[in-house]
C-alpha cells in the first residue's frame, strides 16, 4: 500500500503547471507548445508509474486512497481513490489529452489561454474519475464546463457562440438536477451531512426517494453521454469546435456521463437501477437506430461523425442496463474503444477541413489523390468505427451483445427483439460511414476549392494517428488487456444485484 499522494499530484499538477503558462516569455507560441506537451507527458508518466507499481489489479477494493479535511465547517473532505472502473478512464484521459495538445499546434491566437484551458480540463477529468466524495465529484463535473465553453466560443467556427451557448445551457440545466440529487443523498438519513461514497454505498432509501434521486442523476448524465432526446448540443458543438477540442469532447467528456451512470446510479442506487434497466436497454437500442439514421441524412461530415458518436453511445447504455458481468465489461470496453476511435475521426475530419475549407459532402470528391495518407487513416478508423473484426469496436460491441443475451433480467422475446434492433443499427453504421468515404475521397477531383494547394499529413499528424491506431488494433486482438482492469471490480459491483 502506498501512502504517497499520487492522485492529488495527478489532479493538481496540470492546472497548477498550466497557470504558469502566462509567465512564459511572449516569443511566438513555440515555448508554450513544448511546455504544455512536457506537462502532459510528465503527468502521463507519473500516472503510468503509479498504476504499474502501486495498484493491484486482483484487488477489487478502492486503492491509492487519500482522505484529508478540506472545508472544516461543512465537514467536506478531499477524498480520492481508484479502482478497476476508473483506472481505464484515467489512462484514456492522459493518453488522449497528451495527443490533443499535440494536435493543437496550429493554434496561434491566444495560445497561452488555449493551452491553459486544455490543462484545466485535464485536471477536472482526472479529478472526476478519482473522486471518492460525491460533492467533490460534482465540483469536478462542473469544472469542465468553463474551459469547454471558452474553447468553443473563442476558437470555434462561424456559429461558435450559438453552439457554445447551447452546450452551456444543456449541461448547466443537467447540473441542477445533479446538485439536487447530491444534496438529497447528503441530507437524507443522518444528522451530519456526509457525501463519502463508502458510506453512501451502504445507505438505503425509501423506494420513491431512490427513484427520484436516480432520475435526477440520470438527466445530468443523459446530457453528457448523451442520451436522446438530450443529444442535440453534440452535433452543433462538434460542427463548430476546433478539432483538438473535439478530441477531448468525443474522447473523454462523453465518457464522464457513462462513468457517472456506473459509479453513482449503479453503485449507490441499485434498487432503482434494477427498475430502470429495461428502459435503459430500450433507449439504447432506439438510440443506435435513430442516431445512425440521422447521421445518414447529414450533409456536414463533422455532424455525420457526431451522430455516429451518439449511435455508439447506445451500446454503452445497453451494456449498463443489462446488469451482467459481460454486459458491463463490454460497456467499459466500448467507453475506451470509442474514446480512441471517436477522437481520431474528429481529428481527421478537422485536419481535412482545415486544408479544403469545405465541410459539405456534396462539394467534396476525389481527395484521395492529393491526400493519400489522410485517406488511408480515415478509411482505417472508419473501419474500426463500423466494428471490423480485429479492431476494438468489434470486440466491444460483440461483448455487449453477449451481455444482453445472457442477462437473466430479460425474457427471451424482448432480448431477441432488442438484439434484432441492435443488429439493424450495426448494418446502418457501414452505410453512413462508407457513403461518407465515397463522397469525400472517391469520384472526380475537386476543382472549385477555396484552397487548392492543400498538402497531405505531416510527420506530427502521422505520429499522432499511429499512436492511437496501435491501441485500437491491440484491444481488438487482445481485449483481455483492458478487461483485466475492470473484471474483478465489476463482479464485486454486480454482487449487490443478486444478493439484495
UniProtKB/Swiss-Prot annotation:
Any single Pfam family the record assigns to this protein: Proton_antipo_M
Which GO molecular function entries does the Swiss-Prot or TrEMBL record give?
Answer: NADH dehydrogenase (ubiquinone) activity; ubiquinone binding
Gene Ontology annotations for the cellular component aspect, listed alphabetically = chloroplast thylakoid membrane
Q: What is the uppermost EC class here?
A: translocase
Task: Provide the alphabetized UniProt keywords.
Answer: Chloroplast, Membrane, NAD, NADP, Plastid, Plastoquinone, Quinone, Thylakoid, Translocase, Transmembrane, Transmembrane helix
State the annotated membrane topology for this chain.
Multi-pass membrane protein
Major site of localization recorded for this protein: plastid
Which terms does the UniProt entry file under GO BP?
aerobic respiration; ATP synthesis coupled electron transport; electron transport coupled proton transport
- Organism superkingdom: Eukaryota
Spell out where the chain crosses the membrane: 4-24, 35-55, 87-107, 111-131, 134-154, 167-187, 211-231, 242-262, 272-292, 313-333, 334-354, 386-406, 417-437, 462-482
Reaction(s) catalysed by this chain's protein: a plastoquinone + NADH + (n+1) H(+)(in) = a plastoquinol + NAD(+) + n H(+)(out); a plastoquinone + NADPH + (n+1) H(+)(in) = a plastoquinol + NADP(+) + n H(+)(out)
Where in or outside the cell it occurs: the entry states: Plastid, Chloroplast thylakoid membrane
Enzyme Commission (EC) number: 7.1.1.-
Its family remark reads: Belongs to the complex I subunit 4 family.
Protein name (Swiss-Prot/TrEMBL)? NAD(P)H-quinone oxidoreductase chain 4, chloroplastic
Q: Which organism is it from?
A: Sorghum bicolor (Sorghum)
User: What does the organism's lineage look like at the top?
Assistant: Eukaryota, Viridiplantae, Streptophyta, Embryophyta, Tracheophyta
The coding gene here is ndhD
Amino acid at each position: 500500500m502506498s501512502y504517497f499522494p499520487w492522485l492529488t499530484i495527478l489532479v493538481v499538477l496540470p492546472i497548477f503547471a498550466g497557470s504558469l503558462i502566462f509567465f512564459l516569455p511572449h516569443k511566438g507560441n513555440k515555448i508554450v507548445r513544448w511546455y504544455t506537451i512536457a506537462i502532459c507527458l510528465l503527468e502521463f508518466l507519473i500516472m503510468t508509474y503509479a498504476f504499474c507499481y502501486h495498484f493491484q489489479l486482483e484487488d477489487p477494493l478502492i486503492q491509492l486512497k487519500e482522505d484529508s479535511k478540506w472545508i472544516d465547517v461543512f465537514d467536506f473532505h478531499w477524498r480520492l481513490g481508484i479502482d478497476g472502473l476508473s483506472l481505464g478512464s484515467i489512462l484514456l484521459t492522459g493518453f488522449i489529452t497528451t495527443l490533443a495538445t499535440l494536435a493543437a499546434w496550429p493554434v496561434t491566437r491566444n495560445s497561452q489561454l488555449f493551452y491553459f484551458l486544455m490543462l484545466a480540463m485535464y485536471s477536472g477529468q482526472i479529478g472526476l474519475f478519482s473522486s471518492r466524495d460525491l460533492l467533490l465529484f460534482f465540483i469536478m463535473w462542473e469544472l469542465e464546463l468553463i474551459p469547454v465553453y471558452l474553447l468553443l466560443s473563442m476558437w470555434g467556427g462561424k456559429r461558435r457562440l450559438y453552439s457554445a451557448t447551447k452546450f452551456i445551457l444543456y449541461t448547466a440545466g443537467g447540473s441542477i438536477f445533479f446538485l439536487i440529487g447530491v444534496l438529497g443523498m447528503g441530507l437524507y438519513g443522518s444528522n451530519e451531512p456526509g457525501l463519502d461514497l463508502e458510506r453512501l454505498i451502504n445507505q438505503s432509501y425509501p423506494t420513491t426517494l431512490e427513484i427520484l434521486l436516480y432520475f435526477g442523476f440520470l438527466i445530468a448524465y443523459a446530457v453528457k453521454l448523451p442520451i436522446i432526446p438530450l443529444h442535440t448540443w453534440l452535433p452543433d458543438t462538434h460542427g463548430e469546435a476546433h478539432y483538438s477540442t473535439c478530441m477531448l469532447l468525443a474522447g473523454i467528456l462523453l465518457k464522464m456521463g457513462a462513468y457517472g451512470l456506473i459509479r453513482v446510479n449503479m453503485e449507490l442506487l441499485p434498487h432503482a437501477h434494477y427498475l430502470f434497466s429495461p428502459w435503459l436497454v430500450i433507449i439504447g437500442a432506439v438510440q443506435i437506430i435513430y442516431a445512425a439514421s440521422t447521421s445518414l441524412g447529414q450533409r456536414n461530415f463533422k455532424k455525420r461523425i457526431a451522430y455516429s458518436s451518439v449511435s455508439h453511445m447506445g451500446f454503452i447504455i445497453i451494456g449498463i442496463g443489462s446488469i451482467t458481468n459481460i454486459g458491463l465489461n463490454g460497456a467499459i470496453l466500448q467507453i475506451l474503444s470509442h474514446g480512441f476511435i471517436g477522437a481520431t475521426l474528429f481529428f481527421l475530419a478537422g485536419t481535412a477541413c482545415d486544408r479544403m475549407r469545405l465541410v459539405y459532402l456534396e462539394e467534396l470528391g476525389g481527395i484521395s489523390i492529393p491526400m493519400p495518407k489522410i485517406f488511408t487513416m480515415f478509411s482505417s478508423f472508419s473501419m474500426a468505427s463500423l466494428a471490423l473484426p480485429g479492431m476494438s469496436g468489434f470486440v466491444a460491441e460483440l461483448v455487449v451483445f453477449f451481455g444482453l443475451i445472457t442477462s437473466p433480467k430479460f425474457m427471451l422475446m424482448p432480448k431477441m427483439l432488442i438484439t434484432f434492433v441492435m443488429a439493424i443499427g450495426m448494418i446502418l453504421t457501414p452505410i453512413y460511414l462508407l457513403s461518407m468515404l465515397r463522397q469525400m475521397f472517391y469520384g472526380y477531383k475537386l476543382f472549385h476549392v477555396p484552397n487548392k494547394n492543400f498538402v497531405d499529413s505531416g510527420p506530427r499528424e502521422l505520429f499522432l494517428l499511429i499512436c492511437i491506431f496501435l491501441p485500437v488494433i491491440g484491444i481488438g486482438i487482445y481485449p483481455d488487456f483492458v478487461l483485466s482492469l475492470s473484471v474483478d471490480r465489476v463482479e464485486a459491483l454486480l454482487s449487490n444485484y443478486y444478493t439484495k
